Amino acid sequence: MTEQNIDIKRELKDESPIGQSPHLENDGRPSLMSRYSYSSIEEVSKEGYQWFKHQSVFLKFSLIVLLFSLMFSLTFGSLLGLISLALGFPSVGYRYVLLPILNALLNRLRLNSSGLK
């Protein structure tokens, strides 16, 4: 054990009225909450809020694109709506929307060219 761990345990035990600290894990290590002060948690939460505030514009835009794509696919046909969904969300749309559609179209062309229907 390092001296720092011993000092942390000693500080935690000194704060506890019974001598057993509620901030220790079962094996005697300091718990996650005891490692960080409340001021550092507050700073991290402020930074997270600032990050989310900047990201919320993107999130709102993504939701609008998703809703428009779903309405378009339900109203004007699945193929064009799913393509617009794929354009709005490329990583998800390419794997789960465009590839199956292209695969189905290619299979249809192969069947038609071979004379089978």
Swiss-Prot record:
Protein name, as recorded: Uncharacterized membrane protein C338.18
Coiled coil: none
Residues with the Phosphoserine modification: 37
Keyword list, A-Z: Endoplasmic reticulum, Golgi apparatus, Membrane, Phosphoprotein, Transmembrane, Transmembrane helix
Biased composition (Basic and acidic residues): 1-16
Location of region: Disordered: 1-31
Record's GO cellular component terms: cytoplasm; endoplasmic reticulum; endoplasmic reticulum membrane; Golgi apparatus; Golgi membrane
Domain of life: Eukaryota
Residue ranges of the TM segments: 63-83, 85-105
Entry membrane topology: Multi-pass membrane protein
Protein localization: Endoplasmic reticulum membrane; Golgi apparatus membrane
Broad class of the protein's primary localization: endoplasmic reticulum
